[in-house]
Amino acid sequence: DTVYVTIDKAAVRKSGMMMASDSIPNRMVISLKGKNALYKGDLMMLEMIAQSNWVRPIYVASTVGQENYMNLGDNFVQEGLANRITPFTTNAPGAKNFDTQKTYNNVMNRYKYGGLSRKGIYIDETVMRMCYTHRRIIAQLALHLISEGDKQKANKVLQKAEKELPAYNIPYNYMNGGLDIARAYALLGQTAKAKEVANAVWINAQQYLNWYLTLDGSRFANSMNDCMYQIYVLRQAASVMGMADKQTAAQQEKKLNMLFKQYQEKGGAMPMGDE
């Protein structure tokens, strides 16, 4: 249930890909575990990997479902909106799977944001999902830059996000990386911005939870998972708020406890495994 591809190390060095580990492996390991059959698309991808010799990069869009690229996620290095297939096993301890330099260049210089900063525009669901994807990637990039000690670039990335994906058109929430943005601001010492973004995520989740708590009978019963999700988001938002304003975080924790009590009083159950 494993395929091996012999690696031309010189070709890998010339390819321009990020070296995900200290040494280039002698062979690429592709696990086929869990697959009962290989279809034409799978065989085509394996053939491309075997024949390309790393001269031409092979990418998989970050929005593509796992079922469409076998188990090659073990070999991905993220370069913004695309995952580059590499000969490295990037999910191994100590390996890198995020190319900060290429992602920074993509976000700052190559991506076109299509006028999303213009006030009053209508953003449909499909475009909004892509906005969410872009903001999540920018948040990831900022946190990676901070972890690498490049706070100046991290700040530029956050400014870019605020300019191109403004909150007045794309409100902050948990799904679009709002808390990672807030966390990055906090780590940069910009506590006012961190508080603003974390609070926006909190308010969004609280509004949803308040609405679910107005439901009765089967409608409430069918919404329990959604309630628990919003409670989880509120807990995470309060935690990030604690990095910027401990007093506000304490108030949010108190409010969260009250909301959770309301949920239980309406007959809300804990998820399986948490009881």
Task: Label every PLM stretch briefly.
Residues 1-275:
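ER/secretory pathway lumenal C-terminal domains and tails of membrane proteins involved
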